[in-house]
Amino acid sequence: MERIMFRAKIHRATVTQADLDYVGSVTIDQDLLDAADILVNERVDIYNITNGNRLSTYALSGPRGSGVIGINGAAAHLVQPGDLVIIAAYGNFSEEEARTLEPRVVLVDAQNRILDLQPA
């Protein structure tokens, strides 16, 4: 049996932009994607700490060192610049893999610079 497990998150990121007219997705600073081991086009869930909204979308790469967290498309109705969010990724793992999984947690400051990397 495979289990769907939490494997990575970017915790308490600040949304820097929202573009209702863009065709879906979330744009994330490539440094943050690398730190969280989230790939371009990978499905991610976004949990809005500010207002409680939740949504699923896919990740796009933003410029390295920019701190960009850009909510694109219809999701811009649910998340606004300045909101705090958690961006989480999940994966399918065998029973054995699931029991030894150590998720990556990327903690960031108000400018979305990496403060710490830790297991969940």
UniProtKB/Swiss-Prot annotation:
GO terms for biological process: alanine biosynthetic process; pantothenate biosynthetic process. One of its GO terms (cellular component) is cytosol. It holds the Pfam family Asp_decarbox. It comes from the Bacteria. Binds 1 pyruvoyl group covalently per subunit. InterPro entries: Asp_de-COase-like_dom_sf (IPR009010), Asp_decarbox (IPR003190). Pathway: Cofactor biosynthesis; (R)-pantothenate biosynthesis; beta-alanine from L-aspartate: step 1/1. Substrate binds at residues 57, 73-75. Belongs to the PanD family. Catalyzes the pyruvoyl-dependent decarboxylation of aspartate to produce beta-alanine. NCBIfam families: panD. Heterooctamer of four alpha and four beta subunits. This is Aspartate 1-decarboxylase.
